[in-house]
From Swiss-Prot:
The keyword Transmembrane helix belongs to this UniProt entry's keyword annotation: yes
Gene Ontology CC annotations of this record: plasma membrane
UniProt KW keywords: Cell membrane, Membrane, Transmembrane, Transmembrane helix
Protein's organism: Listeria monocytogenes serovar 1/2a (strain ATCC BAA-679 / EGD-e)
Annotated S-S bridges: none
Source superkingdom: Bacteria
Name of the protein this chain belongs to: UPF0344 protein lmo2265
Membrane topology: Multi-pass membrane protein
Residue spans crossing the bilayer: 3-23, 33-53, 62-82, 92-112
Length: 120
């Protein structure tokens, strides 16, 4: 169950982040609302991640710690990306970092979970 919550929350964070970036020029109010909803999903990701950490540590404790750090970095990069967008500063670098870090984090997550819940 926690795997599904974790996966759905990560997908929601990625979708909400991309939507917020695209919608900013049209509506700053909607942008702020999406940013707040994103933060609720951060809490879900952190809680579900805590509940699943014992299974990841059984697989490989070094990779589990690295995945935890990568997850924290993803949240930080999303926050920087959205705050830079709100301040109308260039976001290209953070967008590139966001894509790279998300791909690494997702890959580690599926490796540590043995593909669960998507490939099981």
């Amino acid at each position: 169950m926690w795997g599904y919550i974790h996966l759905i929350s990560w997908v929601a964070i990625v979708v909400l982040t991309i939507t917020a970036l695209l919608i900013y020029s049209k509506s700053t109010k909607s942008f702020t609302m999406l940013q707040m909803i994103n933060r609720v999903f951060y809490i879900l990701v952190i809680l579900s991640g805590i509940m699943m950490v014992k299974y990841s540590i059984e697989q490989s404790w070094i990779l589990a710690i690295f995945k935890i750090l990568m997850g924290i970095i993803v949240i930080g990069v999303v926050e920087m990306l959205l705050s830079y967008r709100k301040q109308q500063k260039p976001t290209g670098m953070f967008l590139m970092i966001f894509v790279i870090v998300v791909v690494i984090t997702i890959s580690l997550g599926f490796y540590l979970s043995g593909g669960y819940p998507l490939f099981n």
